[in-house]
Structures are given as structure tokens and as C-alpha cells.
Amino acid sequence: MYYYVNKMKKIIPVILLVLSLAGCYNSSEPRERILKIYNWADYIGDSVLEDFQAYYKEQTGENIRIVYQTFDINEIMLTKIEKGHEDFDVVCPSEYIIERMLKKHLLLPIDTNFAHSPNYMQNVAPFIREQINKLSQPGEEASRYAVCYMWGTAGILYNRAYIPDSVATSWECLWNRKYAGKILMKDSYRDAYGTAIIYAHAKELEEGTVTVEELMNDYSPRAMELAEKYLKELKPNIAGWEADFGKEMMTKNKAWLNMTW
């Protein structure tokens, strides 16, 4: 039996946004008849993409082709976009990448005049709006460039056959030498750093003298050194750094703990 415990009490929105890239495109098709999407795997089913093309034809009388690509690491996605190899219309990164993209002027404002969804923007939860606008840059309100698609938390998935419930109540279980070679971590700088720095400040968090948000955004030399120290201590326990194969390893008992989304 597997069980999931929410650990990182931080909202991590996943956002849709429009890009201002002018990458190369070698095709005889008119570019305006192609919708290019860059997304995480498993976020949109193939049938939805097919249905959208039919819906678009029904609404406009025009055909559209969807070019759909996926990524599994935020930084790989950002690097590809920065190099200008693709002119994506829509991408779906995590929130901290949106902040970087705004700083580098990689985005275009979203046309919020949704003809068939007039109430969408007005009905976005105020909390989500607030989280998005925390990413704003001078003169650039983030909600002009990003619309929330999903949000979630990071936590621990564990196999009850090997891990007692009482053990999986703290990040400390990841550093337990009993589970050497049986722990999976996300192949994500942000999540690896966050896990280490939160664990390092467990006492301060419990006392309420610091918040998770403050820790996640602390990139001082002292914080970086501390995170590095704890990640090096964690290394013997790691079975792998994964983005999408964690569930398979867990079901085959090759890993017992998975720091996951």
C-alpha cells in the first residue's frame, strides 16, 4: 500500500503563458494556423488536443494544427526557449521560471478577451491571483502574462510495507540511513534545494520564526552552503533523480520513498 503525505506547505502554481519568441519555422503552412504548445508530460490528454482542433473548426470555420511538445525539467525548457530554437505560443512552467522569463522579457501579454469564456478571469481564485502577482517585475504585472492552469504541493510518497506512518511525518525520513538506496528525489533544482533548506530549518519553522516562502527564496551564500551540506549527506540514500519514472520504481519496490508532486 502506498501513501502520500503533504510536506512542503507552499503553493506551486503551474502557469500557462504566451511567448514573444521569433524562432525559425520551416513549413509551407501559414504560422497562424499552427498552435505550438510546450508542456509537462501527462498534463493534457491526446483526445483533448484532437477535440480542440474540431472545436476550433466548429467555432471559426478554419483548420488548425497543434504541435505539442513536452519537457520534464523546467531549466531545460527555459534554455530551449532562451536559445530561440522554437516559437512556442503557449508554455507551462513552474512559478519561479515565470519570474525569470518576465525579467528576461520573454513573454507577451495574454489576450484576456475570451469570447466563449467571459467570466474566466473574473472567477480565478483571489489566492491564486495573489500568488501569480508575487512574480511581478517593475512595470510588469505577472497576471497580464500568466493564467493559472494547476497548482499543487510537494510531499512524500511512501510504501507502507517498508516505511511506518510515524516515520513519514517529517522530511527527516529522507536522511534516515535505514533507507539507503531506496529514496527518489525530483530532478529539479528548486525542489531539491527547497527540501534541503526546509529540513535544515525544521526547528525554526516549528517555532514560527521563519516561513517556508522565506526559506525557498533565500539564495544567500549561507543558505546555499547549508543546502549543499544536507544534499551531500542525502546522497547515499538516493536511488535516483527522476521526473517521470518514480511511480514505476515505487511499484516495483526499487524505491520506498519518493519526494514527489
State where each predicted segment sits.
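Short, low-complexity disordered leader/linker segments with a strong preference
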Residues: 1-34
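Short N-terminal micro-motifs specific to bacterial/archaeal maturation
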Residues: 15, 68, 164-165, 256
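Early extracytoplasmic/lumenal segment of secretory-pathway proteins
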Residues: 24-104
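Short, well-ordered beta-to-alpha junction loops that form the rim of enzyme active sites
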Residues: 40, 95, 188-189, 260-261
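Extracytoplasmic ligand-binding site segments that recognize negatively charged/polar headgroups
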Residues: 43-46, 102-249, 254
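Short, glycine/acidic-rich beta->alpha junctions
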Residues: 72-73, 166, 260
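Paired acidic/hydrophobic, glycine-rich loop segments that form the ligand-binding mouth/hinge
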Residues: 88-93, 239-240, 256-261
